Every structure is written in C-alpha cells, then in structure tokens.
C-alpha cells in the first residue's frame, strides 16, 4: 500500500487558504503538552491558554479524563488547536478524533497508527529518535515529526545531525524543553516548534491557578516570537 501524507491547508468559503496544522504550530512556536486528570479542569484551562495567546493544547491520552476533556475544549473553542498526544493505538486515534481532536501525536513511530492516520487524512506527528525512524517518516511523505524525549537524547545537536541527511523533515522536540533552553531549540531552523508542559504543570492545574497558567502561556509565546524575530 502506497501512502503519502499531504496535510496541506485547505481553502475556506472565501477561497482563502487556511493554514495547515504545522503552519499554525510554527506561528505559535510552542505547543502546550497537557495532562488532565479531571474533566472539570478542561474548560478553565482552555480559557487560560486562549487568554494567554496560546490557543493550542496537546492533551495526552494518559488519563481517563483525556477524551472528554478534548471534547469540552473543542466545543468551547472550535478554532483552538486541540489535539491528542500519547496516542498508541488506532482505537485511541478514532476516540480522539471523534471527540474533536484536530491532530494526533504519538511518542514513537508505530507504522500501523501512522499509516491509518495518513489513510484517513488525520494530521499525525509521530515520535522519532533514530535515523531509521526518520527514514520511515520520509518514506511516507511526512514533513514534521516529534523528537522525544529531546533532552535525554541529545537535544539540538542530535536534531541537527539527524536533519542533515533527512533535509525535508522538521522537528517538534518535546521532553525537557523549558524557558531556559527554548532559545537553543527555536534558533535552529530545522525545528518547527517545541512541545512543553512548563506552562501547564499539573500542580498549577490541580490548584486552579489558571491566571498563572495564562501568564506563563503569554510569556512562552512572547519569548518564542522574540527568538524568531
């Protein structure tokens, strides 16, 4: 079966081209990686991210609350970039998309999950860590991949080395990315954006400190824009 990814922007009713998911990621510079243990936190968290100028969330499928949280966030903010992370199976892909997820992120490269998403034209950003993973992504026509866990596997230096032979790929490093090293990552032209959880930490969500989350989201977006000019 020959599968090629083609997640390009589509035209709206006025004939204007809409930005693709990847283009929207690039414009933001940062993608919040969210873990929600209680669905009651979904709406106020979405409010905080939108207020902070970061209308995007990769909601990890690690908890029982993930699916319904995606549904709540997507319904409250239809234009928000709400996606599902830590997706391991086709069944989870279907559940996430049915709940309103606009994109799928997986921690590793599972050919079955990736091929399914491509076939269904669901934007998929699979995790890679080796040149063999990168080769599989390129073979399928993918343009953007997650690099995870980033810091534990060499960070920017490894990404630059990996990008040298695989020139068509852009990377979304996640894992160990913070305000302290964001400049190192976003200064690399092979990096599309960074995934991070520092602005949506579990303890802040649990404590209901959504104003602080909004402020931290704002700081992250402003720093990303400053770095990239």
Where are these regions (language model features)?
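Glycine-rich phosphate-binding active-site loops on the catalytic face of alpha/beta enzymes
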Residues: 107-113, 146-155, 190-209
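Conserved N-terminal beta1-alpha1 strand-loop-helix module at the mouth
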Residues: 7, 13-99, 119, 179, ...
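Active-site glycine- and acidic-residue-rich loops that bind
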Residues: 171-179
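Anionic-ligand binding region
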Residues: 131-143, 155-165
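Catalytic beta/alpha-barrel core
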Residues: 34-35, 56-63, 81-88, 101-109, ...
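Catalytic cores of alpha/beta
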Residues: 89-99, 132-140, 178-192
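Glycine-enriched alpha-helix->loop->beta-strand junction motifs that scaffold or abut catalytic
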Residues: 50-55, 76-79, 98-104, 119-125, ...
